[in-house]
Amino acid sequence: MMVKLGNVKLVTDILDQNGQQYSVYSDVTGEPTDKMVDAGLQIYKNEECDFLIGIGGGSPIDTMKAVAVVAAGDGSIDDYMGKRIRVRTPRMVAIPTTSGTGSEATQFTIITNTEKDIKMLLAGSGVMPDLAIDDPTFTMTAPKSVTAATGLDALCHASEAYTSRKRQLLTDEFALSAIKKIFEYLPICYNEPSNVKAVSYTHLTLPTKL
C-alpha cells in the first residue's frame, strides 16, 4: 500500500539525493508475523544493510523493530519472546502513516508466531526507534475506515493511560488533552481528510498522550 500511494518513493527519493543505497521490503500485510520478519531479515543481511526505515501503520513499524532485534543477535524472532531486549540494535527510523498504534514511540513490538498461532511480545530499550518522523500529511491518504479505527485505537491508549494504576498528575494532563482532541478532531478527519488542522491535532495527540 505504501508503495502504491507513493509514500515509499518520497523516502527513497531523499536517499537517492544523498547517495544512500537501500533495499525495499514491502510484503508486510495485516498483522506482522515471524515469516515477514524472516523475509525482511534475509534482505537486510543479503544487502549488508546497517540501518532500517519503517513507513506505514503499526505492522510495518513493528516488523522493522523485530528485524532489528534479530539482526543484532542470533537465532530467530521466536527466541526473543517475553525477553527484555537491551542489545544495541541497528539504527531505526519510524515514519507512521496512521495515528493510533504508537509503535514509533514505544519499547514494544508484537509478532505472530504462525506455527503456534500466538502473539509474541518483545520489549526493551533495544526495540525503541532512534527517530520518529510524525508527518500528519501521510495520514491524509488513509481510507476512512483506517482513520476511524486508528483514531479509536489512540482514544483507547489515552483512556488506558488515564485509568492506569501508575497514573500521575502529569500523565493525567497528557491523557485528558489527547482524549479531548480526539473527540473534537477525529470526526473532522473522517469527513474532511484534507483538513490540515484537524489531521495535525489528531495525529500529534499520540506523542502527547504517551
Regions found by a protein language model. Give the residues of each.
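ATP/NTP phosphate-donor binding region
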Residues: 1-51
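Buried hydrophobic packing segments
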Residues: 40, 63-68, 158-159, 179-185
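Glycine-rich phosphate-binding loop
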Residues: 52-62
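Short Gly/Thr/Asp-enriched flexible loops that form oxyanion-binding sites at enzyme active sites
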Residues: 60-73, 105
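A glycine/threonine-rich phosphate-anchoring loop and its flanking beta-alpha core
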Residues: 72-170
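An accessory alpha-helical subdomain
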Residues: 167-179
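A conserved active-site cap/scaffold subdomain adjacent to cofactor or substrate pockets
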Residues: 178-179, 183-192, 196-200
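Conserved small/polar residues in nucleotide/adenosyl-binding loops
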Residues: 202-208
